[in-house]
């Protein structure tokens, strides 16, 4: 038995193949959009504390948020503090110039002038972070209320 395929059969097969490729590509693009990591930063100083203090300390936070697992990977550098770090926290929800409770303690042993770690956020914490309602605060014995502070903002 001889089977022949007409031009219409090849056209239909080609269209089905094209549709499958496009569907797979769209699905991959949707997955990329929902798991795209978000970069954050903060510039810390004593003038951002509430109330302001005269600290000469400075700091910088860099963080990456992964929405697929709500994980925040952060790196904190600082210098010029009045003494060793006694504690550091993410606070929120709050905008610049407003104090807020601790949202997430940075439970790390701060050695030298920097630290790096990662934390998993709750849905509410992630929403506050993404909305720019978090700040990071570094405490020392001389300034236990906070020596340097910086608002956490998206790094464009």
Q: Which residues make up each language-model segment?
A:
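Metal-centered catalytic cores of metalloenzymes
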Residues: 2, 22, 26-88, 92-156
